[in-house]
């Protein structure tokens, strides 16, 4: 079965409580210019195994247009490669909460973000695999 390349509202991490837990647990991996914070939680009423949020520093990119562009690029990379993530996370009871943060000081193009995202996912799975 093929997964649609969509990004639904239920896949977005919006809960302040869940986002707070991400930073409290401080589990993260990085591949410059991206860093990902992650936490495993019990799956609530969501049918998706992953909830994700995107962030770009206002301190680094002053203009909202530039911040939004980087968020859109990260969203697009996630959307195109989420089927790989979902295949590896086939748990019925656990959900993976992710916060993808752009930490670079200079603008990046889609190809760079995609390459670093894939490298980041390999690092993430290397850390998650021993725990499960």
Which residues are covered by each model-predicted region?
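Positively charged, solvent-exposed patches that mediate nucleic-acid binding
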Residues: 1-132
């Amino acid at each position: 079965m093929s997964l649609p390349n969509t990004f639904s509202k239920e896949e977005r991490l919006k809960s302040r409580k869940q986002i707070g837990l991400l930073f409290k647990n401080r589990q993260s991996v990085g591949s410059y210019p991206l860093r990902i914070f992650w936490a495993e939680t019990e799956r609530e009423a969501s049918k998706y195994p992953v909830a994700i949020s995107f962030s770009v520093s206002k301190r680094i990119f002053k203009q909202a247009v530039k911040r939004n562009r980087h968020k859109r690029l990260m969203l697009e990379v996630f959307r195109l490669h989420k089927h790989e993530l979902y295949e590896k996370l086939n748990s019925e009871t656990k959900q993976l909460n992710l916060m993808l943060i752009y930490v670079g000081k200079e603008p990046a193009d889609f190809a760079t973000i995609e390459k670093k995202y894939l490298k980041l996912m390999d690092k993430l799975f290397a850390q998650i695999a021993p725990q499960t």
